[in-house]
Amino acid sequence: MTAVEQTADGIRLRIMLQPKASKDAIIGLHDEELKISITAPPVDGAANAHLIKYLSKAFKVPKSAVQLEKGELNRHKQVFIPAPKIIPEAVRQLLDNP
């Protein structure tokens, strides 16, 4: 599987998460994963909650729709976003150029 996979139902992302960063951002491709930095620390699920909030805003979907499929206790994660309203430019480029 590549870092970004578009399905009939939505988009699946393989993510390498960088917690405690200076800003929330989609950095780009890193070893076949989409590198995303977030400001939240990796403590008591705060990083996962912040990642879900960030992705819901970036893709314009409800927070409850973003599904953390793998990697709850790991920085390598797999997330499914059903029926995104928009696709951020960094993700669109990976879809257009696999």
Curated annotation (Swiss-Prot):
It comes from the Bacteria. It holds the Pfam family DUF167. GO terms for cellular component: cytoplasm. Belongs to the UPF0235 family. NCBIfam families: DUF167 family protein, PRK05090.1. HAMAP family: UPF0235. This is UPF0235 protein Asuc_1977. It comes from Actinobacillus succinogenes (strain ATCC 55618 / DSM 22257 / CCUG 43843 / 130Z). The lineage of its organism: Bacteria, Pseudomonadati, Pseudomonadota, Gammaproteobacteria, Pasteurellales.
